[in-house]
Amino acid sequence: MLECLSALLVLFAGGGGSVLAAVQSKTVADPNLCPGYNSQLISPFLSSCKRNLSECVSRYFDEQYAFCRSCVTVNNETMEDLDNCKCLQCALSSLNNSCFHDYCTSKDEYDKLQIVVEQFQLTNGVLDDGEILKPRGNKFSSRKLSYFVGQNNTLFRNPLQFEKNQLISALLTSLTNNQKTISSVDMFEVVDANNEVQYLRKRTISGKTLSPATGYEEENDGDCSVKDKKWEGKIEYHENKKVSSENCSKDTDDKSGSKKERNTKAPLFHTATEIHMTRWSSWRPKKIFTRYLVNEYQSPKIITTVNRFYRTKTDTETGTTLITSTKAKRRWFPRTKIVTSTATSTFLSITTTTTTNAIATKSLVAVLNPDGLNKKAGINFGLFSANGELASPDEGGTPTVVRRDKISDPGAANEQATLFSTTFSQVPHLPELDSGEFISAASQLDKRIFIFTAITVSITTLMMLGFSYRSRVSFRDHSIDDSDDDNDWSDDEVEFDEEYFYSLPVSIPEKGISLDKMAQQLGVE
């Protein structure tokens, strides 16, 4: 790091007046004046660049931004320099955009330079290029020093040429890998206005001296207060070199004529680096390098610690797949098919006529012996007794009931009327005969056969008469249109009223009735 030198410049203005301006060059030439820049936290990495890199950076310094000609921020009240962040940004931009590709050859060093530039912009922000600066006239302004007013009444001034050169030199020194070289103070000094450097003389362990540096005379080698006469009067453009008394040659007695004894102690620099592994995340480890620069040339020894920080970039690639779905609506047109079925049904109509012929039955005559028995027992035949009297209620006689029923057959489309005759008869209990009274069984049997035959003929005759005169049954053919009436099987079709029941006028002949009278009662001609 360059030593700071305070110079007092006396600038004369036109008209014979003089103005005294105090400029603290150390503040502008030091990169650490910017709050967002710390050279101790940056690990040097430039090693493949040419010597005249600083000339290129200085040449393109003013062309980077509009504010590069007035980049020093000044306090409005005390007129002291506050920071040089804009000047430092101009120097980094000139190195990165204009000079690196022409003077350096390492791709790895270029990537590291991008990290330094991005870190500086993240810390200090991207300075505005379009800031309008207005000139301001005050008593401190001169031909070489001018002040400008920016936004928010911020005061700026232009850096002097030597301040700009020293700032560029200090910046390149902090970025240059000096592992095999001495620090900037012990390694080179300023020898011309363009800040061209020349190596200082070095002493080896063997005692052999190197050839003197260009611009120095041999007679001034042993003089500790040596000063280049060529650049005398231009002290404001470079720094004075201070050499400790330990490094000077020890002179013997001049009168003895012995030669000067040179110090054979050679400067010794070595670098120690410690690597610490840490984890900032669960999947990517972090390496932290701690570098110690030991200068054994001076006493006491100087140990410089350099911490290197890495800025990790994460690139995320996202693949997008476009899926397109197409919906098609299909329209269906219905088709109607009409099927006509024709069914032909044939119904058979059958009419049945029943004819009953009267059967002539001869009457059987049963003759009872009127004198055979003292007491004759009558025979009970239904409603009438054998003697022509009505049967008593206790004999349980039941009148003969004849009903007529109507039968409809929908399947055969036929109606048939049937007469039902039901005869309930009960044979009465015969009284016991007295002694000495007998009756012929054969005569009783013949009489019963005759009576039953007469009853059967009478019932048959009445049935025929009912069909002929009193029948309400009409036989007709049914058609398909009457199918609904045929399916009606309600209770009304089978109900009977008093018109359907008839009492038969049958009377049992009395005892000793003649055949003609019996036939008349039975209705037989």
Swiss-Prot record:
Primary location group: membrane
**Membrane topology for this entry?**
Single-pass type I membrane protein
- State the species of origin: Saccharomyces cerevisiae (strain YJM789)
Record protein name field? Uncharacterized protein SCY_3380
* Region: Disordered, residue numbers: 242-264
From the broadest rank down, the organism's phylogenetic lineage runs: Eukaryota, Fungi, Dikarya, Ascomycota, Saccharomycotina
Alphabetized UniProt keyword annotations: Membrane, Signal, Transmembrane, Transmembrane helix
Q: Which residues cross the membrane?
A: 449-469
- Extracellular compartment ranges equal 22-448
Q: Where is the protein found, in the record's own terms?
A: Membrane
List GO terms (cellular component aspect): membrane
| Signal peptide positions (record) | 1-21
Chain ranges sitting on the Cytoplasmic side read 470-525
